[in-house]
Amino acid sequence: MSFEVKTTPHFEREAKILAKRYKSFKADMKDFVESLEKNPMQGDELSPGIRKIRLAIVSKGKGKSGGARVITYTICASESEGRVYLVDV
């Protein structure tokens, strides 16, 4: 699958705040984006195309349940390609 991951301005603001608070957040997000490019259909579907995915923040030390929730919006051009927008965290 070849999915491109893009961010919204709102997501960038929220991610910047979390990156200042948790040192591992940038590395965690990089791993998350790589995972999302391979499998954009992970997480719980809230409505068609919109998904909620749990993200563990390593420096927070509480696993996925105490980590962040990332809201994504997926647009599929075909089954093997499309775009994933990171909407909120």
Question: Can you annotate each of these PLM segments?
Answer:
Residues 61-62, 68, 73-89:
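Enriched for short, Lys/Arg-rich terminal
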Residues 1-64, 78-80:
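Basic, Lys/Arg-enriched alpha-helical interface segments
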